[in-house]
Structures are given as structure tokens and as C-alpha cells.
Amino acid sequence: DEGVAFLVRCENRIIYHAGDLNWWHWEEEDDAYNRMMRGDYQKEIETLAGEKIDLAFVVLDPRQEEQFYWGFDWYMRHTDTKIVFPMHMWKQYEVQDRLIGMEVSEPYREKIMRIREKGQVFEL
């Protein structure tokens, strides 16, 4: 997948926006493609090592079926992020609850800001 991700420093805060950067894994793709996407994603996330990220927007895409959480989980386990907003949910907000209910999210689930509707406002 092509796109950009941003790490923004502003007013003593660090904000990360993943854009389309994700561990894209698609069952219809061959193993070589999926391995390449995994490696590319993991390499990019490694560049965030040592950053103390105040706020992040990270892909949690239900279209990836059973692999929907792989990129989000990798990001959260390999960065120092205080608050994270899932994105790319295609209005299927229940995907957040699915991740939060999984054992894998235990170390970071309290950092996930749950989005329930379009236009929802958050005060941080």
C-alpha cells in the first residue's frame, strides 16, 4: 500500500498519524507480498524507537479479517505511546471492542480511545 505517515512535534507534544502505513496482510495476496508488507511496516515502526508519543492515530481495519489487529498491536508493543485513536474502521466501530476483548491488547487497552460515531468530539 502506498501513502504517508507523519510524526509531528508541536507545543512540546509529539503526534503520530499513520496515514495508510499499516501491516497490510491480505489472504488473497501471495506469501511473498505479505512478508514484504510485514517487513516494511516493522522497519518503519522501528524508526519511532525512543520517541515519547503523546497521541497517535493508528490503522485498525476490519477488512483484514483475522489479521485486523496485527499492525495496531505491533505499533503499540514497539512504541511509547500515551493515547491512541484507531482509524480506518469503515464505521465498523465494534472492531475496537473486538481488539479490547483480546488478551493480546492487555498491555495497552487502557490507552485506546474508543470511537463510537462520526463527528465524535474528545477532550484530552
Question: Where are the regions that the model predicts?
Answer:
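Core dinuclear metal-dependent hydrolase active-site scaffold
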Residues: D1-K52, G119-L124
